[in-house]
Amino acid sequence: MKLQTTYPSNNYPIYVEHGAIDHISTYIDQFDQSFILIDEHVNQYFADKFDDILSYENVHKVIIPAGEKTKTFEQYQETLEYILSHHVTRNTAIIAVGGGATGDFAGFIAATLLRGVHFIQVPTTILAHDSSVGGKVGINSKQGKNLIGAFYRPTAVIYDLDFLKTLPFEQILSGYAEVYKHALLNGESATQDIEQHFKDREILQSLNGMDKYIAKGIETKLDIVIADEKEQGVRKFLNLGHTFGHAVEYYHKIPHGHAVMVGIIYQFIVANALFDSKHDINHYIQYLIQLGYPLDMITDLDFETLYQYMLSDKKNDKQGVQMVLIRQFGDIVVQHVDQLTLQHACEQLKTYFK
């Protein structure tokens, strides 16, 4: 399947299919040089997939650390200096091969190298179906996740679904959080549909039917980011579960999607408190348990520490913390939430696991 952005200009294709990696070769000849920034784990399992591409004299491979460990100033400078040592021109391509962190990092390299070079996303995880589309790139700060970055559109997104076959279950769980988030944004019917399909760990682990839901997720994100590329309005909805989730992820060092799932439950609790919504918290917790999410760390959540991270969230303004909340299905808002409400919601979340 080939999708296409529909901005007024500078559009890019998104290939979502088995064997999509073959599309890379059609781009290589266009560039003076290309640098494949590949996650160390992906390189371990799939290095041979890139043998043909690396046979080109103008293509170089750079193996980078897996996951969030790569999104540091130190790794950023080291990688930039290596690329610059090859006397690159602006007609250079940075090709990101890996999960969401790899795409974030490589995209920031592309956005800042010579003030901008070509950028191709080759996501290899379920999680990256979300981050590879929409143009957000960046690295982390000691103050929080993704606080240093840019909006930078790729030249192409090449999503080869064959990469998903070897994902460990932890990465399947992490990626599914973003697929599930897109279903929540699409409403009650879409949420019921995905819950009925992926009803337990065994089905989720099999990835049976995942291709369809990944495609739906990408289409959902495309509709939103084309309407609001720079996150001034509806694009903020894509941060559902991320205000609290990023804080949990950054402090407790758990996978992104696991933390987002905790953040999704948390926002349901906040919505119930602020709007007298009737979200069934037990239902969502039991669903996560059925799928195999490890939730034991919830009892160790320390609100004061997490709150400091929440204060650094990019959605905030001078009035304080803003959260994306599902008031009711089909009625999503970005709402200021006071510290006391946030604290009570955290304490309530913990009571479900005592």
From Swiss-Prot:
EC number: 4.2.3.4
Chief location: cytoplasm
Taxonomic superkingdom: Bacteria
Keyword Cell division: no
Biological-process GO terms, alphabetical: amino acid biosynthetic process; aromatic amino acid family biosynthetic process; chorismate biosynthetic process
Binding site residues for Zn(2+): 178, 242, 256
Function: Catalyzes the conversion of 3-deoxy-D-arabino-heptulosonate 7-phosphate (DAHP) to dehydroquinate (DHQ).
Name this protein carries in UniProt: 3-dehydroquinate synthase
